[in-house]
């Protein structure tokens, strides 16, 4: 869908970089990031001594882990002036606590950047979405990776975005029309703090979560699905690892050559049969029919698109059309497992 603004325009308009993480317990933060990277197949030793590019690091909190792995070169491509200041302050403070490689901040947009030398590892987390421009940028991003290098990006399903889509729609009844960003954030923090505090391991600051998830127009670009990613970057890449781990490949390893490899096809088949599990991490259900899952995902996309269109048009009334779209998704979820009938029914 077409949004009035993207992430960057919104950030620049308000001079914000609302992606800060709580790193007061730095050891815990680094362990969390290390667990993620190890799970996707990139342990610390695979980063050490490598040339790394990270696109859209925001305030830089997540970059601390990569820096602590001592890459040979660490470039941060970030066009947001507010983020530059926060990155510099973050590294100034934390380099006193642990050994860090000082990153090079490249103060450009991805659209204006060209890499004269390719990187071993390219990272772009939770930024590029599904609109035409951002899918083209994904293609550009992939060209910065050396042959047999690693590209780390955020992929996902609209099903995984559903809880935040519902929270976003509910926020329409909380904030007043034409309120300032500051007033809207204060109202949302007041409304959602008790709820957010039930998420034990949430690390994003509540203020930034409200600015980014409940108010930022870039929310509606979502993340590309794995199928979109493969379509955009072609067969130059295969999905090497993911978190959560999606596929279990029981084929005989000696058969994995030439046209038999089909790593992406095996991953996509497993992914489509498991996307219902993105809705609620409290339940891990058995794989189910791919077509039923894709129908559920389409309903989730429909709801997200409707909410985004309403906001673009200035119509944030939770009326029959919105409720009907929500119920269409809920009905499909309740069919999957009766556990969801109580909170969703």
Residue ranges of model-derived segments:
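Conserved alpha-helix/loop element of class I SAM-dependent methyltransferases that forms part
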Residues: 26-49
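Conserved SAM-binding loop of SAM-dependent methyltransferases across substrates and taxa
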Residues: 59-71
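A short glycine-rich, Lys/Arg-flanked "PGG" loop and its adjoining helix->strand segment in the class I
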Residues: 135-147
């Amino acid at each position: 869908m077409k949004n009035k603004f993207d992430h960057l325009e919104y950030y620049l308009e308000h001079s914000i970089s609302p992606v800060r993480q709580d790193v007061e317990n730095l050891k815990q933060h680094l362990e969390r990031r290390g667990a993620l990277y190890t799970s996707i197949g990139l342990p610390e030793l695979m980063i050490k001594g490598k040339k790394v590019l990270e696109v859209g690091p925001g305030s830089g909190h997540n970059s601390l882990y990569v820096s602590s792995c001592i890459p040979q070169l660490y470039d941060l491509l970030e066009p947001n002036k507010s983020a530059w200041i926060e990155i510099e302050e973050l590294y100034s403070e934390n380099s006193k606590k642990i050994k860090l490689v000082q990153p090079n901040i490249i103060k450009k947009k991805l659209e204006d950047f060209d890499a004269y030398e390719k990187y071993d590892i390219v990272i772009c987390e939770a930024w590029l979405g599904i609109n035409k421009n951002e899918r083209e940028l994904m293609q550009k991003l992939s060209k910065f990776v050396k042959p047999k290098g690693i590209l780390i990006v955020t992929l996902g399903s609209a099903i995984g975005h559903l809880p935040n889509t519902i929270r976003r729609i509910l926020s329409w009844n909380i904030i007043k029309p034409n309120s300032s960003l500051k007033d809207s954030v204060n109202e949302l923090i007041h409304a959602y703090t008790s709820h957010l505090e039930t998420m034990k391991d949430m690390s994003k600051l509540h203020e930034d979560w409200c600015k980014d998830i409940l108010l930022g127009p870039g929310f509606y670009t979502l993340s590309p699905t794995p199928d979109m990613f493969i379509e955009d970057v072609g067969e130059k890449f295969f999905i090497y690892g993911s978190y959560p781990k999606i596929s279990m490949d029981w084929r005989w390893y000696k058969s994995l050559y030439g046209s038999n490899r089909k790593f992406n096809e095996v991953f996509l088949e497993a992914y489509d049969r498991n996307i219902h599990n993105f809705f609620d991490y409290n339940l891990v259900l058995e794989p189910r029919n791919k077509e039923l899952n894709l129908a559920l995902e389409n309903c989730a996309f429909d709801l997200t698109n409707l909410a985004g269109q309403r906001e673009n048009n200035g119509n944030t009334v939770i009326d029959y059309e919105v409720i009907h779209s929500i119920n269409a998704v809920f009905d499909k979820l309740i069919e999957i497992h009766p556990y969801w009938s109580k909170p969703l029914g």
